[in-house]
Amino acid sequence: MRALPVVDADPRERKFVKLGRLAQLAGVLPSTIRHYMRLGLIGADAQTPGGYGLFDPERALPRLRRIQDLQSQRFRLIEIASILVGENGVGAA
């Protein structure tokens, strides 16, 4: 697991959003994103001093949309993980 930068400033002053806001923007439940995180499909970009994950919506939203698109094509999440690795050349980033 990679070390995440800690963001001391108020996340509203930065481009980062918390998981709940990312879920709202993506139109999914926070538990869906947590599940994707457990599977390595998506990861936080930074964290608060308290350890909460922060996400760059410019990076995370396209990835969530890609996951949703692949699911609509009937791919299983394990298959989606392989596809994303192949597309990006890396894991969940």
Give the ranges of each region predicted by the language model.
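Arg/Lys-rich, alpha-helical DNA-contact motif
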Residues: 1-25, 38-39, 43-49, 54-93
